[in-house]
Amino acid sequence: MDMTNAQRLILSNQYYLMSQMDPANAEKYKRQQLIVERGYELQIRELDKDFGCITETECREIIDFMEMYHAMQESYNMLSEECQAKVDARRLQFLGFDIATEAQQVNYVRFLTSSEGLYPQFDKADHHFNSQMPMLDKYRRMLTTWRNCPRQYHLCSTELAQIFNA
């Protein structure tokens, strides 16, 4: 993060004010103030680690993944009990993304479900959409298979299995 001296002074003052307003986190803010004042470039990087940027294309792709899961869940609910028995219902749960390698995607899913109120039927589970394993490539393969299905919102058990196994 490149900052002018004036920007560093403003940020330093903000950290000082935060340390006064939030005594429980005062040490954290004082440390951040010191990093900014002294210009420690390595540590300054940790100050902006949560600043991300997801392009419009990436946002739409994530929404497509979530919509695919919504369609699979709705399709499952429309199946007969006999056909439902052929589907592993656990695989209908949208797991999210890996926080270690796909943090921006996890945060976007959390934003969509919490702040925007979308997909309330998705179970956040204990991990709140942290799948704990990379999922982006898997979802892309699944999405390709789903898009090739003639009736995307009325899938049969065979089509669900094909999507799961993509």
UniProtKB/Swiss-Prot annotation:
Residues spanning the membrane: none
Q: Which Pfam families does the entry mention? A: YfbU (PF03887)
Query: Cross-referenced InterPro entries, in alphabetical order?
Result: UPF0304_YfbU, YfbU_alpha-helical_sf, YfbU_helix-hairpin_sf
Source organism's superkingdom?
Bacteria
Q: Which family does it belong to?
A: Belongs to the UPF0304 family.
Q: What is this protein called?
A: UPF0304 protein VFMJ11_1926
Source organism per entry reads Aliivibrio fischeri (strain MJ11) (Vibrio fischeri)
